[in-house]
Amino acid sequence: MPAEVAAGLPPLPPNHFYFYPPDPLLEGDGAITAIEDSDPFDQYVYRLRRVLYQGRTRWQNVLIADTYNYDRVLMLDGAIQSAESDESLYHELLVQPAMLAHDEPRDVLIIGGGEGATLREVLSHASVRRAVMVDLDRELVELCREHLFQWHQGAFDDPRCELLAEDGRAYLERDPSLYDVVIIDVVDMLDNGPAQALYTRQFYELLHSRLRPGGVVAVQGLEFSHSDDKPHAALARTLRSVFSQVHSYRATVPSFLSSWGFLLASDWLDTNHWQAEDIDRRIERKLGPLWLDHLDGDYLKACFVMDRETRFLLAQPGPVLEDGVPFVAPPDIEEIEFGPAQLPALART
């Protein structure tokens, strides 16, 4: 942006947007510029074709807009939460590995997932008889129902769906129902944010008690890049303190401007034994060969492959996330000297 324009702007409050008026350089198409200010060190600028909704629910700032690069986007508290151009990649990666791993998922719990795309992916499985979606923000869900049909594709109206507007942890505390698969698709663990209590050991212990034998949990695993991997590693350690098998995987989600992490947690599923051919057969048997846009056996196997430094990081001991205790990142991995002798067996798998 021109320095003289930037100098005249008021300071940006954290987790908010600042909107420029239409940009005359874009040939009079009325484009609006939005600055994403969710990172304390970087800001990202987006050209918006059209703003469909801008406002605040009880819980968060919301912007739904059409963009030039990512088509329609949902932005929450100053960051892109989901984009039409790549939401199917993200949601397939979050949901389908757990659903494919379970032989016959019948009862599924979704915590978060307000856009409805997580629900859409769950309901793609004919075996599902009940999909309970618990999202704290009723207003956001209604906005997504109105403006983000490409995401939910009518899933909210499926008779198998039970939609509840309440805190996911409170729901588990009051309802003793058991589930075959649980999908956690909540916003990042911002300090003092409503989702913070959904990332702790105590929450996962409660969640574990609501799984049937053979159950699988899939978790949105935060940014998982070389510049920001410690929160994911802490989340993986926390899950390992409760579940016998925890496996990280990641993929680049373009609209997130980073690699993104996911986790599978259970007491039985070892993804190291997965074969691409077996995954392809499960997809064809459970969904049909043309259902998924992105996922197949080769790609999913590749998502679990980590570089040597990341394997070392994930194998390190460290604190887990606890109720009421802020997360403090350990020293950078570059500050730790390591070689083959220091690489634990877990890090070599």
Curated annotation (Swiss-Prot):
Residues 29-267 form the PABS domain. Keywords: Cytoplasm, Polyamine biosynthesis, Spermidine biosynthesis, Transferase. Its main location: cytoplasm. CDD domains: AdoMet_MTases. S-methyl-5'-thioadenosine binds at Q60, D135, D167, G168, P194. The active site is at D185 (proton acceptor). It is found in: Cytoplasm. Pathway: Amine and polyamine biosynthesis; spermidine biosynthesis; spermidine from putrescine: step 1/1. GO terms for cellular component: cytoplasm. Disulfide bonds: none annotated. Its EC number is 2.5.1.16. The keyword Transferase applies. It catalyses: S-adenosyl 3-(methylsulfanyl)propylamine + putrescine = S-methyl-5'-thioadenosine + spermidine + H(+). InterPro entries: PABS, PABS_CS, SAM-dependent_MTases_sf, Spermi_synthase, Spermidine_synt_N, Spermidine_synt_N_sf. One of its GO terms (biological process) is spermidine biosynthetic process. It is an enzyme of class 2 (transferase). Spermidine binds at H91, E115. GO terms for molecular function: spermidine synthase activity. Catalyzes the irreversible transfer of a propylamine group from the amino donor S-adenosylmethioninamine (decarboxy-AdoMet) to putrescine (1,4-diaminobutane) to yield spermidine. Homodimer or homotetramer. Belongs to the spermidine/spermine synthase family. NCBIfam families: MFS_SpdSyn. This is Polyamine aminopropyltransferase 2.
